[in-house]
Amino acid sequence: RTLHERWDETPLCGPNEHGDYCEDFFGGDLAGITEKLDYLASLHVTTLYLNPIFEAASNHRYDTADYETVDPLLGDEQDFRTLCTEAEKRGIRVMLDGVFNHTGAKSRYFNADGFYPAPGAAQGPISPYYSWYSFHPFPTDYDAWWGIKNLPAVNERNESYVNYIITGENSIVRRWLRAGASAWRL
């Protein structure tokens, strides 16, 4: 990750030494949004739509690494809760972006690079997440969003995946609604 000090610094153009794109970060966090709520309310803003806030390798965060963790560059769960509480006081709702048809290859669920200590789908059937993905054959080929291999597609009909994301008592959707989100963009 390249974290720039100022907004006018030149971003990296092209892949880094690992072949990854989108490694430039220009700051901005949940606490900063909270600080601007009075200004946003003065503009009659009623909804804040946040791009994905979950831990991810890229700056766009559509390659979710962990749905249970706010990306540390944005803050933490308490920062999110504070944002939602303070926004609600001003009549502003917070909408999260739910990227649930794929994860990042570098996620705790797929774990292509072995970064996480627990096995991901890339480590095979020993992983509780293996059935979330479709391999043809394992481990070299798998379904991916638009064929982009660092965005492995999930089987949205897999019962354990649906339970984890939507239907379970402590599902991701319910968890973040309880934390203060008002809506999801799917």
Regions found by a protein language model. Name each.
Residues 95, 183-186:
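Short catalytic-loop micro-motif centered on adjacent basic/acidic residues
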Residues 1-46, 53-179:
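Substrate-binding/active-site clefts of carbohydrate-active enzymes
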